[in-house]
A protein has these predicted regions:
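Feature captures the catalytic cores and cofactor-binding loops of soluble hydro-lyases/lyases
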Residues: 3-7, 11-127
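Phosphate/diphosphate-binding glycine-rich loops and adjacent basic-rich segments that engage nucleotide
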Residues: 124-138
Length: 138
């Protein structure tokens, strides 16, 4: 499976796929990485898949805080390009913090990967499904 890399990078981790858009501002605790609405689990270390991000430009600041605090996802895969989240990732890299890959993969392709599936992402946007059954921590 191949995604479009917006900000290239390599990552691996369990997929957390949400079927609804997410606002990082008010939707994610920047200190812990916890989602504030169901499924109320942590996004830290996951390959977070979303159909879209919603919200204001403050979402880039929340993602920047997640990266600074070590509570960010390992990679972010969206159904459409989102410049606001990309800005947060770019700012983290400029500040010397770990930046994460940002990719675009359409909803039909996202639906082929279940939450808990371990994936590996290469720098070209290739997504290799490694195994099923990872437990996402609540």
């Amino acid at each position: 499976m191949k995604a479009q890399p917006i900000l290239a990078g390599c990552a691996r981790g369990p997929v957390l796929r949400l079927d609804h858009p997410l606002s990082f501002w008010g939707g994610v605790d920047p200190a812990s990485g916890a989602l504030l609405a169901p499924p109320q689990c942590s996004i830290a270390g996951t390959v977070l898949m979303l159909p879209a991000a919603i919200g204001s430009s403050s979402s880039s600041a929340v993602l920047l805080e997640l990266l600074r605090n070590g509570q960010a996802p390992a990679a972010l895969i969206l159904g459409q390009i989102d410049a606001i989240l990309g800005l947060g990732i770019l700012a983290a890299g400029e500040m010397g913090w770990k930046a994460i890959p940002l990719l675009v993969l359409d909803a039909a392709e996202q639906a082929r990967i279940e939450t808990g599936t371990w994936v590996e992402i290469d720098a070209g946007g290739g997504i290799l499904q490694m195994r099923q059954g990872a437990h996402i921590q609540a």
